[in-house]
From Swiss-Prot:
Region ranges (Disordered): 228-254
Organism, scientific name: Flavobacterium johnsoniae (strain ATCC 17061 / DSM 2064 / JCM 8514 / BCRC 14874 / CCUG 350202 / NBRC 14942 / NCIMB 11054 / UW101) (Cytophaga johnsonae)
An individual GO BP term: translation
GO molecular function: structural constituent of ribosome
One GO location term (cellular component): cytosolic small ribosomal subunit
Name of the protein this chain belongs to: Small ribosomal subunit protein uS2
Entry keyword annotation includes Isomerase: no
SUPFAM superfamilies named among the record's database cross-references: Ribosomal protein S2 (SSF52313)
Amino acid sequence: MANKIEVKELLEAGVHFGHMTRKWDPNMAPYIYMERNGIHIINLYKTAAKIEEANEALKKIAASGRKILFVATKKQAKDIVADKAKAANMPYITERWPGGMLTNFVTIRKAVKKMSSIDKMKKDGTFNTLSKKERLQVDRLRAKLEKNLGSIADMSRLPAALFVVDIKAEHIAIKEAQKLNIPVFAMVDTNSDPREVDYVIPANDDASKSIDKILSLVTTAVIEGLSDRGAEKEVEAAEEAPAAEAEAAPATEE
């Protein structure tokens, strides 16, 4: 059951403000509470329940050691998503979505490795043997790669899930995830089709306060999942230690 404090917090963050009624998607009807001054108002009790449902699944994914890729390229969401994803130690895309990011992941990984090889060149001195023009070209390439792919440099395999802010803006990312059966979690406003995603969080996806509130709640669940994983590993290590010591101990003669 969604608790009242959470609903009050959602209300204060303006999560309930949808789009103008003429822009609505009829599939969002179950999540709409009412119409006010030509604007659809989202039912925050349903939003709170959907956050809890999404958080439970996100926590499990994080606890299993898999990655959740956060995606938000719109201006008012970029910095918020980057900060929250970083805090949760998860990859994110806040610049233009690189076409084939998921469906052609091998090529994307090659581009990420190119960054590493440039860094290696700078460390071992190879970079200094290049001409001034070549060094400039390499630096430009490194900066471009960092801007577009730096935030996914640690993602060595496909993510277990996507978390998206604004499914209309990120429709290419969602299509790629669908092709690969990667579950999509998303903030879905009243002008969007919730059938496009697996875990719908009905919410205002335009106001920064609303985006910040939802991202704070979901990344807290992710961090809890990571914490559970860490605690589990510590317990396993503690259980294995006595057995390892017993095996290593020399046999004593009677």
